[in-house]
């Protein structure tokens, strides 16, 4: 058999010589819709993909429901949520030895299982599910919905009769009407209905299903108070603090309340408060969706509304913004991602401070996993918002349409914005690191009393104003003689509007308002440094994307060109891709600090020992030794020469995550000549083995490609490593 020489493609005597390993990188334009589709088809394809996205979400939920109903222990967990570990699914692995089978056979299972840390058990329990039949029925329902949405996506994307016109996509008022009223408003109203008719009765021991749904009143008075205007009747007689969730013991009859705080039995928000919240959201959004002019000649015209916005004698006006937002898809996506990213971070906060799901506050591993998961997701989404905002400025921004409006002035004043952000980053960085390093030196020289410890008195004052009494500020809700405390009645318990608030905020077993000290002060400023630096990089990358002071106009460069040093004319100054690339590292860095802080603080609260955090968090060695190293000890002993335990999979993942993370640096710190030699060596090796021929011409990675590969490895390894550490160190203490 004649071997094909690996040089044949290079020499040009092979008809496939035009093919190179660069072909692998065609996926980089997979989201460049305008290069792939024309005109209205771009909008139609995006619209159709939304149905596919929803179908995937339903399929994911359906799969979880199916696995738990068939392989989980939902019914056993329901009977004792505090002492039963939830099972995600069974494990069938022929590589398991006897000790592995024994270690992973837990939570009452007959064989090896994976435990659930997703909070799904708590969610399903809270919304009224109680049996495996409930789960399997819901699974089938969502599977059918998923198929229907896939069909809808196909019809709207590929069947000419059902493809929407361009006018449909440009009709902003109708889109707002549909999104605000139908998607947000009606779905919130439907969820309120489920909570009132199914979840709240179930939490009080009353089983509601299709056979008695229409014959059982969710409130003793039915709809009479609604039609008579006596709406307060729905909030009278709420559940007591002693109510045992899932039973009638201590249950009330109220369905829409404003108690505030957390249920002391479940550690979660009151279900009747949640129902009230969703009803209010429904009313607000249904009304908001009908404020704009659609089929009738009433309501606001959005363009007139936006362009009528003149501030300071016409400066900073909004003329041209309506047309810009309504025609520029990257700007629309950037705004949507910015909003969703912020909401996702807020969800992470609520997962621990105001948990909506019963008994999730007592499942520490799940709380830690959900908080960390949502913060990382938020970081990626918000960086994506800046990336698409930058692509908008490079490819879609029209200076003539936006002449002298607020967007144009934002670009004109970019030097001031960037310099102020830069100053803030320098201030935060030098001062925060200076304090940490000073404290490290004092500990190293055995004079801890010389540490600089700053009490966060302003933050403590804000907590005290909300009712936190441990600081002895005696201000507003933390003072029993304050008007805020006494109004509207003189009763100490019911004087404030949210009667359950003071009980919850001063309960040190929850995370509602956690006590803070000098360690918190320092790490808050470290996190502020990370946030501002990430923002600086992203904002500068966006504002200088089309051209900077050094290079006035490089719009034709596009978005994805590298920062290649001053030798090529200083493209570092305006490489938007490079700014995004660098910002991802800072985003990961910042979320690392956030999750370290959150986890260490909560380990102390959960274990009833907050002193270690207060004493060790004021200097860097404390973080490295008493948080990272100390909490790694169980993890790295998941398997050793003497055997293994149930943490072994996390130990392996911890090691593997480090490997992926470290591999990233091979791509990030290297010369391109090295890549050319390496890839040619690989192709030569392939050609020596005739069954694995490599037809393409070997071409090294470009700068952008190598950085992209390195960034992906760095990111995946970074997150896998911390995920393993987080779950293993928490479950090792509270299993």
Curated annotation (Swiss-Prot):
It comes from the Eukaryota. Gene3D superfamilies: Photosystem I PsaA/PsaB. NCBIfam families: psaB. GO terms for molecular function: 4 iron, 4 sulfur cluster binding; chlorophyll binding; electron transfer activity; magnesium ion binding; oxidoreductase activity. It is a multi-pass membrane protein. Its EC number is 1.97.1.12. The chain crosses the membrane at residues 46-69, 135-158, 176-200, 274-292, 329-352, 368-394, 416-438, 521-539, 579-600, 647-669, 708-728. Chlorophyll a B1 binds at residue 658. It catalyses: reduced [plastocyanin] + hnu + oxidized [2Fe-2S]-[ferredoxin] = oxidized [plastocyanin] + reduced [2Fe-2S]-[ferredoxin]. It holds the Pfam family PsaA_PsaB. Keywords: 4Fe-4S, Chlorophyll, Chloroplast, Chromophore, Electron transport, Iron, Iron-sulfur, Magnesium, Membrane, Metal-binding, Oxidoreductase, Photosynthesis, Photosystem I, Plastid, Thylakoid, Transmembrane, Transmembrane helix, Transport. [4Fe-4S] cluster binds at residues 563, 572. GO terms for cellular component: chloroplast thylakoid membrane; photosystem I. Belongs to the PsaA/PsaB family. PsaA and PsaB bind P700, the primary electron donor of photosystem I (PSI), as well as the electron acceptors A0, A1 and FX. PSI is a plastocyanin/cytochrome c6-ferredoxin oxidoreductase, converting photonic excitation into a charge separation, which transfers an electron from the donor P700 chlorophyll pair to the spectroscopically characterized acceptors A0, A1, FX, FA and FB in turn. Oxidized P700 is reduced on the lumenal side of the thylakoid membrane by plastocyanin or cytochrome c6. P700 is a chlorophyll a/chlorophyll a' dimer, A0 is one or more chlorophyll a, A1 is one or both phylloquinones and FX is a shared 4Fe-4S iron-sulfur center. Phylloquinone binds at residue 675. It is found in: Plastid, Chloroplast thylakoid membrane. SUPFAM superfamilies: Photosystem I subunits PsaA/PsaB (SSF81558). Chlorophyll a B3 binds at residues 666, 674. InterPro entries: PSI_PsaA/B, PSI_PsaA/B_CS, PSI_PsaA/B_sf, PSI_PsaB. Its main location: plastid. This is Photosystem I P700 chlorophyll a apoprotein A2.
């Amino acid at each position: 058999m004649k071997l094909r020489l690996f040089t044949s493609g290079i020499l040009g005597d092979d008809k496939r010589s035009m093919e190179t390993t660069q072909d692998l990188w065609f996926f980089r334009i997979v989201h460049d819709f305008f290069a792939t589709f024309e005109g209205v088809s771009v909008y139609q394809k995006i619209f159709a993909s939304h149905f596919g996205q929803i179908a995937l979400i339903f399929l994911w939920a359906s799969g979880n429901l199916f696995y738990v109903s068939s392989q989980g222990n939902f019914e056993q967990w329901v009977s004792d949520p505090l002492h039963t570990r939830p099972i995600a699914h069974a494990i069938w692995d022929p590589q398991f030895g006897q000790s592995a089978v024994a270690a992973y056979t837990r939570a009452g299972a007959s064989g090896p299982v994976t435990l659930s840390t997703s909070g799904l058990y708590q969610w399903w329990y809270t919304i009224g599910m109680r049996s495996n039949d409930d789960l399997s029925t819901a699974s089938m329902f969502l599977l059918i919905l998923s198929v229907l949405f896939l069909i809808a996506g196909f019809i709207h994307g590929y069947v000419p009769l059902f493809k929407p016109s361009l006018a449909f996509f440009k009709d902003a008022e109708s889109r707002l009407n549909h999104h605000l009223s139908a998607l947000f408003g009606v779905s919130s109203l439907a969820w309120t209905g489920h909570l009132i008719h199914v979840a709240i009765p179930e939490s009080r021991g009353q089983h509601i299903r299709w056979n008695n749904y229409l014959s059982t009143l969710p409130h003793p008075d039915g709809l009479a108070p609604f039609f008579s205007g006596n709406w307060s009747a729905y909030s009278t007689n709420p559940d007591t603090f002693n109510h045992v969730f899932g039973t009638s013991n201590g249950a009330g009859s109220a369905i829409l309340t404003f108690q505030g705080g957390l249920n002391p039995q479940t550690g979660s928000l009151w279900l009747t408060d949640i129902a009230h919240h969703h009803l209010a959201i429904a009313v607000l959004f249904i009304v908001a969706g009908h404020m704009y002019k659609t089929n009738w000649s009433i309501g606001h015209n959005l363009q007139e509304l936006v362009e009528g916005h003149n501030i300071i004698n016409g400066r900073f006006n909004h003329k041209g913004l309506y047309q810009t937002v309504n025609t520029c898809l990257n700007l629309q996506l950037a705004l949507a991602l910015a909003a969703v990213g912020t909401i996702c971070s807020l969800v992470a906060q609520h997962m621990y401070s105001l948990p909506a799901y019963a008994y999730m506050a007592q499942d520490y591993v799940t709380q830690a996993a959900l908080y960390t998961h949502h913060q990382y997701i938020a970081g990626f989404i918000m960086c994506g918002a800046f990336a698409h905002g930058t692509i908008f400025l490079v490819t879609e921004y029209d200076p003539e349409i936006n002449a002298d409006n607020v967007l144009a002035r934002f670009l004109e004043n970019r030097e001031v914005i960037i310099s102020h952000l830069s100053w803030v980053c320098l201030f935060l960085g030098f001062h925060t690191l200076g304090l940490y390093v000073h404290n490290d030196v004092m500990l190293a020289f055995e004079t801890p009393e010389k540490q600089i410890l700053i009490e966060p008195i302003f933050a403590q004052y804000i907590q005290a104003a909300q009712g936190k009494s441990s600081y002895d500020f005696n201000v507003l809700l933390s003072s029993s003689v304050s008007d805020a405390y006494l109004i509207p009645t003189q009763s100490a318990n019911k004087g404030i509007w949210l009667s359950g608030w003071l009980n919850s905020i001063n309960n040190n077993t929850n995370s509602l308002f956690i006590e803070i000290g000098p360690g918190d002060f320092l790490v808050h400023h470290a996190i502020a440094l990370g946030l501002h630096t990430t923002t600086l990089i992203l904002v500068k990358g966006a504002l200088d994307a089309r051209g900077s002071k050094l290079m006035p106009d490089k719009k034709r460069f596009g978005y994805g060109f590298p920062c290649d040093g001053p030798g090529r004319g200083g493209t570092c100054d305006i490489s938007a891709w490079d700014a995004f690339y660098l910002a991802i590292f800072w985003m990961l860095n910042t979320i690392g600090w956030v999750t370290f802080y959150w986890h260490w603080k909560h380990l102390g609260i959960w274990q009833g020992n907050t002193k270690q955090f207060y004493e060790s968090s004021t200097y860097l060695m404390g973080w490295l030794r008493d948080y990272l190293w100390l909490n790694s000890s169980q993890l790295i002993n998941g398997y050793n020469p003497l055997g293994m335990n149930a943490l072994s999979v996390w130990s392996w993942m911890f090691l593997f995550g480090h490997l992926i993370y470290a591999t990233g640096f091979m791509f990030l710190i290297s010369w391109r000549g090295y890549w050319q030699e390496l890839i040619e060596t690989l192709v030569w090796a392939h050609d020596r083995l005739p069954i694995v021929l490599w037809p393409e011409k070997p071409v090294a990675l470009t700068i952008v490609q190598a950085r992209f590969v390195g960034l992906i490895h760095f990111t995946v390894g970074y997150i896998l490593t911390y995920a393993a550490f987080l779950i293993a160190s928490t479950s090792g203490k509270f299993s």
